[in-house]
Regions:
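Hydrophobic side chains in well-ordered alpha-helices
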Residues: 8-11, 41, 176-179
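Core AdoMet radical
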Residues: 1-16, 21-33, 52-64
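Auxiliary Fe-S-binding modules of radical SAM enzymes
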Residues: 48-55, 60, 66-281
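Charged helix-capping and loop-helix junction motifs
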Residues: 6, 39-40, 244-248
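Catalytic cores of alpha/beta
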Residues: 33-47
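Charged, low-complexity, helix/coiled-coil-prone segments
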Residues: 17-34, 161-164, 189-197
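Aromatic/hydrophobic pocket-lining residues that form the small-molecule binding cavity
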Residues: 8, 38-41, 84-87
């Protein structure tokens, strides 16, 4: 519906003529621009890759994100596991071709595709220097690698038993189960993983950073949350203790009957689950 969509190649040529460089993103809408259209899009973008000063440095292929706030007549639908497998099957062979041409994958699939498809994420090395991490390409893989490192030398037991709840988006829950199992093998540690949906956005499969305060209340209000609730900091606006739906962290703390700890990374999650951090933050 964008009247200038057909001008993309001319616009990229304009960038190339002026030695301007971009990292591109392709948003896939099932039945609209996947399949052969996606392959053609990536080949078109690859015309501007390679050489001493490429106009297109990398491409992220991401699924369309649909919320309940969109027009009902937009003709779009959410990505399902079959769609995800189809997109992966279309892009991975092209990555091998691009490796031969550019010594780089050039085009990367965001982590959501593999999680939606129920497949293992690619190796950390395959993301090279993570050029598209801000677009969700490799961010979960990097987080899993950090969790693996943080749980490498766990103690056999903890001095004081600690029962915790850890909240994540439903989409990443299954990928975190091995880490949960390792932590719960420590005597005295009881960690429950809550993979939540988002009634606020109208999404069943959601990443952790999109969970809102209302989603947390909806999913946790009647749960046994133990001694503490671990909330990843990505749920809050940067530098501001407010969720995406404008609910404040103070309001959540006043409503849920459990101490809430904001955790800022893999090492802090593990330390909190082990009871190694005393003061709630």
């Amino acid at each position: 519906q964008n009247p200038r969509a057909g001008q993309l190649l001319q616009q990229l040529a304009w960038f190339a003529e002026r030695d301007l460089q971009i990292h591109a993103q392709v948003v896939i809408c099932p039945d609209q621009n996947d399949g052969e259209a996606l392959q053609r899009t990536l080949q078109d973008l690859a015309q501007f890759a390679g050489g001493e000063w490429p106009a297109v440095l990398s491409v992220a292929v991401v699924p369309v994100g649909l919320t309940r706030f969109r027009p009902a007549s937009d003709g779009l639908r959410a990505v399902n596991p079959a769609d995800a497998k189809k997109v992966i099957a279309a892009v991975e062979p092209l990555q091998k071709e691009f490796q031969t041409r550019f010594e780089s994958n050039f085009a990367w699939l965001s982590d959501e595709w593999y999680l939606i498809a129920g497949l293992s994420l690619p190796s950390r090395a395959s993301y090279e220097d993570f050029p598209q991490q801000e677009n969700g390409v490799g961010s979960i893989r990097a987080f899993l690698a950090a969790l693996d490192e943080a749980t490498t030398n766990l103690p056999q037991s903890v001095e004081k038993p600690v029962k915790s709840s850890w909240v994540v988006g439903r989409l990443v829950e299954a990928a975190l189960r091995p880490v949960l199992k390792r932590l719960n093998a420590v005597e005295g540690v009881e960690l429950t993983l809550h993979g939540l949906t988002s009634p606020y956005w109208g999404q069943d499969q959601v990443v952790t950073g999109l969970l809102t305060g209302q989603d947390l209340l909806s999913g946790l209000m009647d749960q046994d949350l133990g001694d503490q609730l671990l909330l990843p900091s990505v749920m809050l606006r940067q530098g501001d203790p407010v969720f995406l739906d404008d609910m404040t962290l103070d309001h959540l703390r006043a409503t849920l009957p459990v101490p809430i700890r904001i955790v800022h990374g893999a090492a802090e999650i593990v330390a909190s689950a082990l009871g190694s951090i005393e003061k709630s933050t």
